A protein has these predicted regions:
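Intrinsically disordered, low-complexity terminal regions
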Residues: 1-177, 182-185, 194, 202, ...
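P-loop NTPase nucleotide-binding/switch module
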Residues: 189, 206
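Short beta-strand segments in beta-sandwich/barrel cores
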Residues: 199
Length: 276
């Protein structure tokens, strides 16, 4: 063959090799993302919850905490297309409806007047989705329902990106904490404490609304349908808040430390009073 023919054949072979290598790399890099998407079956089950005053939805973790720490950092389970409806029941006990596939890993623990729902995934799940190497698992739990006795005074939701809705609640005092967002609707509280998360309110009546500005990322009130008496704001940092027109009748600022400050943006005429 001519020298030019050898050169052309070499270029063709090199091209094939480059294409094969790039295809292999693309396949390898796409595998972890595809294998880290956990879609649970839609079949559900229900477990009974004991009478309690405090309810905790504990963080998802493994029996072996070392599996949560890979060379690339701490692993996490992040929910998507997962929501929780929270409602009261006129009974001494409640219930949780969730995917049947999670039943072997879910337990209910009681300590005094506190009820804790714990989801402890086995080591096999972490290895299957390569979480022993670090990273994030996207999990789809679908729609779930949490029914709690009306006497519950505190609800902590510690599943990341769990979208929750609390409705038809009427009580003297309720404290809420979430790692994501909570929509409150058709409820009435004497005292409502928002300690962490994002919150929206629609058709809600609250005489005293307590908001921790250090931990509450945002809150929105549908002024046309809500009735809020006094908003008690507190924090230990520098905060900036906008009070919507008709959001509440009174705002009170309670700094936790001397260095804390609050800048308010008002959308209507107001009277500012400084106590002696």
């Amino acid at each position: 063959m001519k020298k030019t023919t050898y050169i052309l054949l070499g270029m063709v072979m090199t091209g094939f090799i480059i294409i094969a290598v790039m295809a292999g790399l693309a396949y390898c890099f796409s595998q972890p993302a595809a294998s880290r998407h956990w879609v649970l079956d839609k079949q559900q089950t229900t477990v009974a919850l004991p009478s309690c005053s405090v309810f905790f939805l504990q963080p998802i973790h493994s029996h072996n905490d070392e599996l949560l720490r890979g060379g690339r950092g701490r692993s996490r389970i992040y929910l998507e297309r997962s929501d929780l409806a929270i409602m009261p029941v006129d009974a001494d006990s409640g219930s949780l409806t969730f995917p049947l596939e999670l039943k072997p890993y879910l337990s209910v623990v009681t300590q005094g007047d506190t009820c804790m729902v714990c989801l402890d995934l086995p080591d096999e799940v972490y290895r299957k989705y390569r979480l022993d190497q670090g990273g994030t698992l996207l999990a789809e739990f679908g729609h779930m329902e949490l029914k709690l006795p009306a006497g519950v005074q505190q609800v902590d939701l510690n599943w990341e990106n769990l979208q929750s809705e609390l409705h038809s609640w009427q009580c003297d005092s309720l404290s809420l904490q979430s790692l994501s967002s909570v929509d409150l609707c058709r409820s009435h509280f004497e005292h409502l404490y928002l300690r962490q998360g994002r919150f929206t309110m629609d058709e809600v009546k609250v005489n005293h609304l307590w908001i921790d500005l250090d931990e509450v990322y945002d809150w929105k009130v549908q002024a046309e349908s809500c009735e809020i008496g006094i908003e008690h704001l507190w924090g230990s940092q520098q905060h900036h808040c906008q009070i919507q027109r008709g959001e509440c009748k009174e705002v009170r600022w309670n700094p936790v430390v001397e260095e804390a400050s609050l800048t308010l943006s008002l959308q209507q005429s107001a009277h500012v009073h400084f106590p002696e």
